[in-house]
Amino acid sequence: ATAQAAALRWQAHCAERWLAACRPAVVVWPWENHAWERQFVRIARQSGARTIGYQHATVAQREWNYSPKTNSDGEKSLPDLILCSGAAGKDGLLALGHPADRIRIGGALRWKNNCVRSSDPTAPVYVALPADHLIADEMIVAIRPLAEAGQTFVVKSHPMYPYDFTDTPTLQRTDANLADVEAISVVLYAATTVGLEALLQGLPVVRFIPQGRVSVDVVPTGFKQPAADAANLSRALDSAEPTNISDQVFAEPDLETWQKVLFPSSTN
C-alpha cells in the first residue's frame, strides 16, 4: 500500500545513474544501514567509489537495523569505513558485530558542551509527545491527575503529528522546542529524541513506559535514566536528577581523520 519497494527501486536506479555520471572517488552520507543504503554501497563499490558512512544518530536499544547480521550479504553491503559521532556510537556498533577495522570516531558539530544548563525545580515539566498517538494518549491520561493536583506541565506535540487536548491552567500546550524553553524542572518523553536532547543538556529526564506497546528507547545502550509507567510517574518526576552524557555521545570533530578519509591522496 505504501509502494515502498517501487520507491527503493527508483532510488537505486537514480543512485546508479548519478554514480555513472559523476564518477566520485569517495561518497559519504548519514548512515543507518537501511535497505536503500545497502544497495547504494553495492552500486557504489561496482563503480569504484569508496564508501564512508557517518553514524549520526544514536545506536540505541532495539535498533537492530544497524546490525550487520541483518544484511543478506553480511559485510559486503557495509561501507568501507564508518565514522562515528562519538564513543557511544562506536561501542554500540562493535557490540552489534561490526568489524573494528572499519570503525573510527569522526566527532560531531551538532552539539557543544556549552549547551548544558541547569533545571529549575519550580518550573513546569516539559512533556515531549511521540509520533504514536496511542502512547501520547497514555501520557496525557497519566499527567492529567498530577496537573489537577497542582503540578504544572507544558506539552509539546511531535512536529509531524499534532496532538489535540484541552488546556487547563496547569496543563498547557507549547510550540516551543526544548532548547527554547527558558525554565524546565523535568523532561518527560517516550520514543522521541527529545529525551536524548534533554540528557545532553544535563536536564532531569524520565522515560514514560506505556502499557501494551513497545516504546523504543532512543538513548544509547549503556546509559540509564529513570523510567516510569502511569502508576509510578509522580514519584519518578519528583526524584529525577540531571545527568550529562554529551561528551560520550558526541566527540569533538576530528578534522584530521575527516581529511584523511575524504582526500586520501592529499595526505600521502
Which stretches of residues belong to each language-model region?
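Acidic donor-binding loop of glycosyltransferase active sites
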Residues: 179-190
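Conserved catalytic-core segment of nucleotide-activated headgroup transferases in glycan assembly
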Residues: 95-167
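Structural motif
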Residues: 29-33, 84-87, 128-133, 156-159, ...
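Catalytic binding pocket for nucleotide-activated donors in carbohydrate/polymer assembly enzymes
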Residues: 55, 78-79, 97-105, 164-170, ...
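Active-site and donor-binding regions of nucleotide-sugar-utilizing enzymes
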Residues: 1-109
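Short, well-ordered alpha-helical microsegments
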Residues: 35-38, 90-91, 135-139, 162-164, ...
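C-terminal alpha-helical cap of glycosyltransferases
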Residues: 248-268
